[in-house]
Amino acid sequence: MSHVELQPGFDFQQAGKEVLAIERECLAELDQYINQNFTLACEKMFWCKGKVVVMGMGKSGHIGRKMAATFASTGTPSFFVHPGEAAHGDLGMVTPQDVVIAISNSGESSEITALIPVLKRLHIPLICITGRPESSMARAADVHLCVKVAKEACPLGLAPTSSTTATLVMGDALAVALLKARGFTAEDFALSHPGGALGRKLLLRVNDIMHTGDEIPHVKKTASLRDALLEVTRKNLGMTVICDDNMMIEGIFTDGDLRRVFDMGVDVRQLSIADVMTPGGIRVRPGILAVEALNLMQSRHITSVMVADGDHLLGVLHMHDLLRAGVV
């Protein structure tokens, strides 16, 4: 395209709003196609013993990739196969236990229609999503989902806009309906998203990130305050646990306790840790979620917490550990 000048006063915002208005109308019309065929499609996908295989060419292929990704992350195992590659060997990835979803707005994609006889021969259920109920793909499908739109948002009527939005929304409707039918939970979602923020919050446990062994700051009850302070600075967690030879907790001493000692105006050189420690102390179990420990620490306004089985010290968790793990 040759260079053109921007028309004086051209309103980009108005052009954008017109697109939204057109696509809103098209989505409102889509409601009529959530019908018995939609139920049949969901049932085939729900009872599928294999995977949901999504196919599409061009823009429909891009929508198909997103659709497959949404299915896979919401409890419906799925993957995308390019129809052109399927015709040259990749169809071997599809089994009779699978369900195929084929996408084409015209319903006449030659790359897909060429595959239909093979899919039929293998008795693979075929769900077609098209904008034309009378198309070849719609007629060949076991279930046809219509995504017909009145007009594209593109003023030329050429670039797939409203039609791709309608197809994407139909895919979301399938995915969420199946999610609800399966009783899919946030914890299930986290299992397929371990690297995401939600995954870290719902999967990471205290014992995954707590300090253990030699990293635990601890002294005996007979230690001087000076020795306890040295332990605090060596382990750099802003606290030390007071425990016996069997790592049974007797108390805790934090940097906040140290400030209170100085406010007392006493000679710190003459004090033992037993004189100034806080008996007992807040502790959490090692198996709880890290986000639960975070909530406790925030509610109690503390930056570190003991990890214990009853009174038996197992580790220490600091707010910095939660930050590094991405829980905060």
Curated annotation (Swiss-Prot):
Catalysed reactions, semicolon-separated: D-arabinose 5-phosphate = D-ribulose 5-phosphate
First-tier enzyme category under EC: isomerase
Binding-site residues for substrate, renumbered to this chain: 75-76, 82, 88, 114-123, 148-150, 222, 275
Start and end residues of each SIS domain: 42-184
GO biological process, one term: lipopolysaccharide biosynthetic process
Pathway given in the UniProt record: Carbohydrate biosynthesis; 3-deoxy-D-manno-octulosonate biosynthesis; 3-deoxy-D-manno-octulosonate from D-ribulose 5-phosphate: step 1/3; Bacterial outer membrane biogenesis; lipopolysaccharide biosynthesis
Entry keywords, A to Z: Carbohydrate metabolism, CBS domain, Isomerase, Lipopolysaccharide biosynthesis, Metal-binding, Repeat, Zinc
Keyword Ubl conjugation recorded: no
UniProt keyword annotation of Zinc present: yes
UniProt binding sites for Zn(2+): 82
PROSITE patterns: CBS, SIS
Domain CBS: 210-268, 277-328
MF terms (GO), sorted A to Z: arabinose-5-phosphate isomerase activity; carbohydrate derivative binding; metal ion binding
Site description Catalytically relevant, residues in chain: 59, 111, 152, 193
EC number: 5.3.1.13
Cross-referenced Pfam families: CBS, SIS
Subunit field text: Homotetramer.
Primary role: Involved in the biosynthesis of 3-deoxy-D-manno-octulosonate (KDO), a unique 8-carbon sugar component of lipopolysaccharides (LPSs). Catalyzes the reversible aldol-ketol isomerization between D-ribulose 5-phosphate (Ru5P) and D-arabinose 5-phosphate (A5P).
Annotated family: Belongs to the SIS family. GutQ/KpsF subfamily.
NCBIfam families per UniProt: kpsF, PRK10892.1
Listed name of the protein: Arabinose 5-phosphate isomerase KdsD
Taxonomic path: Bacteria, Pseudomonadati, Pseudomonadota, Gammaproteobacteria, Enterobacterales
